[in-house]
Each structure stands twice: as structure tokens, then as C-alpha cells.
Swiss-Prot record:
Coiled-coil segments: none
Catalytic class of the enzyme: lyase
Protein name: Phosphoenolpyruvate carboxykinase [GTP]
GN (gene name): pckG
One MF term in the entry's GO annotations: manganese ion binding
Cofactor(s) named in the record: Mn(2+)
Catalytic center residues: 275
Residues reported to bind GTP: 274-279, 390, 421, 516-519
E.C. designation(s): 4.1.1.32
Function (record text): Catalyzes the conversion of oxaloacetate (OAA) to phosphoenolpyruvate (PEP), the rate-limiting step in the metabolic pathway that produces glucose from lactate and other precursors derived from the citric acid cycle.
Keyword Nucleotide-binding listed: yes
Keyword vocabulary terms for this entry: Cytoplasm, Decarboxylase, Gluconeogenesis, GTP-binding, Lyase, Manganese, Metal-binding, Nucleotide-binding
Amino acid sequence: MARDIAAPSSVPTQHKELISWVNEIAELTQPDSVVWCDGSEAEYERLSEELVRKGTFRKLDPIKRPNSYYAASDPTDVARVEDRTFICSEKEEDAGPTNHWKDPAEMREIFAGEQGVFRGSMRGRTMYVVPFCMGPLGSDLSAIGVEITDSAYVAVSMRTMTRMGQPVLDELGTDGFFVRAVHTLGAPLEAGEADVPWPCNSTKYISHFPESREIWSYGSGYGGNALLGKKCYALRIASVMARDEGWLAEHMLILKLTPPQGESKYVAAAFPSACGKTNLAMLEPTVGGWTVETIGDDIAWMRFGEDGRLYAINPEAGFFGVAPGTGEHTNANAMKTLWGNSVFTNVALTDDNDIWWEGMTEETPAHLTDWKGNDWTPESGTPAAHPNARFTVPASQCPIIAPEWEDPKGVPISAILFGGRRATAVPLVTESFDWNHGVFLGANVASEKTAAAEGKVGELRRDPFAMLPFCGYNMGDYMGHWVDVAKDKDQAKLPKIYYVNWFRKNDEGKFVWPGFGENSRVLKWIVERLEGRAEGVETPIGILPTREALDTAGLDLSASDLDFLLTVDKEVWREEAALVPEHLNTFGEHTPKELWDEYRALVQRLG
């Protein structure tokens, strides 16, 4: 299977630049062999079997979970490493205050200098060349990358998460543009040295070079650190491409909402982690006659079409979801998606060779093998699955995937939602006055870090646009880009922007809104607003539903609870507004003037 890289006849592309780059990386990393991935089913099976032989994969019960595998990572390699994630822009100012910057020349020396960590890093291993496309092949909204990796786990995962293999090389032609992504586990094998099931290195670097559109990742085999099409390309590098080319690369789900009568609407929504993004993307509405279908659960690439509307694609081909908390009662559609063809990492194993995690079932099994390989019972006092345990599954298996989820033209976005986890102050749903006010709402996305004292605003963790860990350039400039993309557009065709909060708590510390499927009631009001059919009331912070406009029929929600969810307390909001300048000042002169205008207008409206 290994091909001699030096013989052009054995290389499945005529792209000179790509061939020369692959040769260059092979020379640097010194793998035993080089394999160009073709993305075929046969290749997937072969690599999966190799991973089983190595002990990385364990095949799950073929009847309960066909063509599915279990993997347990090294206990030190379980999540994204934000403190080891670098933006290596030419100027430090371009990375901004919320990213870790490193001088690109210095970083290249660390990687490829005389003592560079990539030097010989693939010794004793196979180097896989993984051509992949973010978005449907052939779409004007899509973009190509090539990941070089010494991890077969990455190669098989990329087949699920992206369009991968020979069709991508065919699309690339002889001179097409591609983002260069280099990944090594940083675990070379000397001759005769035994391998471990999950190789990695205690030193880790996840580095992005925005100007040259490159990603270099060292030392981790896990998730977003290693599947470089996901956060590294689709958000950090793509956000820079979007800035330069006038589009948006966003940490957003995309869903299709169809009322009993009338046209379907497409909605994009950005929430920080642990705010129920995947649950909303796969929502089962409780409102009669309404349907939700999924376009994407994590990332949206959006461009303005010739008709002046904003069109979005889901650049991914799979779901890489957090397993714990996903269950029949929280996300039945995700559970149905996971029937087979899935890889589960760091979940627990049942005695009959299936998987389990916290929140998956009402009843906890009496005995499991936990993610570290230990015997586990409910008395163990530790989680059976790691809190960041993941599933990797083709999006096409989702029972409510929209037929147009791979439409190369994308889908027209009518509404954009922002939201965080706020126990206090923030109402259930707020419509922005206009686009710039909506950008102001997005810029102030926050979740509470600490429990708030009664009536007080708790300490906030700001996560503008839910992009804080994923923006590839200065966050102040990024906010400015949101203002700029709409400047010359027909305002009537822009998506309306909303801020939602499912997480308000009462004085007893209990959630007031039931959430989950009931969130469809809020979506219903939004669609009716878009159609000009629903009442709204102007408040100092935006437009809220009137009590009658929000459909609460059949909901166990008292009038006082509804008032609580739809009231703007001016005094609390003066406190809230007082926190904004410190946040906007973080970005200094990079903060767009328009956001300061919005802040001053808010203060004035609050009186």
C-alpha cells in the first residue's frame, strides 16, 4: 500500500505544488512509508482493522452497533489545549488580546529548525496524505485542505468529518488552492520499539499561520487538536480567509424550520459550549405541526448571494459531538444518528460490548468498564465516561437531516441567534433593533462563571459570537468585520438577529423555562416576527414578545413565570451595561466605533 513518494507516476495527482510540499514534509518527518488516502470504503475498513490490531480501536457489537469502534485516549490527551493553541500572525496586534501569539519565524524554528520537534517525528510510522474538502465538492462556498498525519485514527475520522480522498484531488486539479495542515503525534518509533495504543507527546503545539494559510499540530491525537479540518481550518484559518474575502466563518449550527403553513426558514445560531447547540440543531418541536430539520450542528460558512441574501453551508460532513448528556430525553435524534458507522472515544464500555455515558439512559448500568479501562459501578464515585467523551458519525445518518444539507448554493439565512448560559438579567428572547445592534448583542455573548447573588449579575465569562477560542485574528477587527459585511447591503434582506437565553433561574435556583423541545415555542415567535405576524414590545434592550405572542399553550408555566422571563429590569440592566466598557476596551482601538455607538444608545434608553 505504501507508495514511493519520489515516483510521480505513483502519486494520484498532477498538482506540482502539492507533490513538492508532501516531499518536503516527508523529508522533515522521515516516515517509514507514505500513503495517499483515496477515501474509499475499503481503505476505511483496512485502516480500522489496523487500528484494532494496534489496540487503538475495539470493534463494538456488530448487531447493536454495526461498523462501529471504541477508542480510549491517553488520559493526558482528552480535549482541546487552549493554552497551547497559537496564532502566528506576522504582527502580534493581528492576533489580538484573546489569542496566544507567537512570532511565526520563531515557531517555524521550533518546528523545523535544526532541533525542530517535527524533525524525524514520524520515524517508524506511516505518513498519511489526507486531501479533504470543507463543504460540498464543487460548491463556490467550499474550500480544500490537505492534512498530512501519522495517525490512522485521524485518517479514518477525517473520512467521516469531511469529504475526503481522490475526488478532492480531482477537484483540486493541477494548480488549485489548498490549506496546508501538518499533524504529528510526536511519538517516533525506533527500530524494534513497541508502540502504545494511543501515542502522543506531553509537549503540544496547535499553531496557525494565518497569512500563509497553514496549520501545524504537534503532540496530540485528540479531536480538534488533530482533526485539522474542524476548528483549526473551518474557524481559525477560515475566519481570516472570510475577513480577506468578505464572508463569514462562524461557530454556528444551521437548522431548517417549517411551519404548518408557509415557507421554511433557515436559522443559524451561535452558543458557547455547554449551551445546547447540538440539541437545538436536532430539535424535536413540541409545537404542533412545526418541523425542524438539521443542516449542521457546529460550523457555518456564510456568503452574500447575488440576490443580497446571506447563504450558508455546513462545511462538515459529520458530527463530532460531546457524548455525556446526550440521551433519548435530551436529544433523541442524535441517539438515532448513532446506530452504526460511528467511532466513540473515551466513553464507557458495557459488559455486552456496547457503549454508555452519563445521561444516555435513565438507568445506570450495574457494571461498566470506564474510559480508563477500570471496572466501574455506580458506587465508584467517578464518571464512567470522560466529560469530553466524543462520538464521530456521518451527518447523513441523522434522521432529520434536511435534503438540501449538501446543496452547493447553500441555504438562505433568515435569522441569526446568539445566546449564553445566563441565570440572571437576560430575557428568554430579544430581537435586535437592526443589524449593528445585533452585532452588539453578539459581541456581548456571555455565560455566568459564578452563581450570582439574588438580583445581581454574576461574574461573566465573555465569549463574543461564541468565537473566543476559534477566531484566527484580532477579535476587535472580527467585530468590525461583522459591521462591515453588511454596510453596502440591502438592510431589508439581512437576517434578523436575536439573543436567546434558556437558562434563567428563579430565587430557588431552578430553571424557569423548560428548554429542550419547548424551545420551538421561541423559534415559532421568531418565524412569525420574520413574517410580520407576531407582536413585539420595544424595551431598552431590544424587542421582546408580548405575553400573548409567545405560544405557551399546554405549558406548565405560570403568568408570573412568563413575566419573569419577559421582563427587562432597568436597574439590573444598568449594572449589566456598566460591564460593557471594560469588555469593549479589551480590544482598544480595534473595537469598531459602531459598537460604542450601540453602547451609548443602550445607556440612554436605560435612562
